[in-house]
Amino acid sequence: MLSFPAEVTNVQATALLQHLVEQVAAETGAVLTVDASAMERFDSSALAVLLQLRRDALAQGKTFSVKGLPPRLRELAGLYGVAELLTAAT
């Protein structure tokens, strides 16, 4: 499981994405789960990172899900029309 930090804004997004993409490649399971429960401060860059991780996971034949997506980020995803792409982990 990959974990997001408390803050994911444009300032951190590029470095975070590079770090997490490496971890996606190293994940051996069939499901890639991202834990977003620690996120407190974020902007739309957090969605961009999540969506890129989803693309990478799907390209590797993995299922993608998000655990603990903050309600405000879920609302933002809805506004952008991508909420259905961020499936909740069970």
Model-assigned labels for residue ranges:
Residues 1-45, 52-90:
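STAS-like cytosolic regulatory interaction modules
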